[in-house]
Amino acid sequence: MKVTVNGVEYSFALNSFAPTYTYEVIMGEPFSGATTRNIHVMMFATLLASNPDEWKMTLAQFTEWLYDHPAEEQTMASAISDEFIRRAELSLKKKKE
């Protein structure tokens, strides 16, 4: 999917492990989704991993931007949730086979 931040369109791709790996480098722990902070850092990690040459915002700048853009925050949070639900369902399906 695409996300527009400060008038620039960026890819927001959760179809690889790159966002998760980037999250783990930033946070020093696996993603749990248990806190708003976890989710916001995953959003940042996804944008950074999806746009390695274009993304220039710091995490602090991004969280300030998020505060003023709740609709975009919700869209990205839903995409993250949907992807982790999809992964969990695939894992359960594999266990049943």
Name each model feature, range by range.
Residues M1-E9, F17-A34, N51-E97:
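Charged interaction scaffolds used for protein-protein
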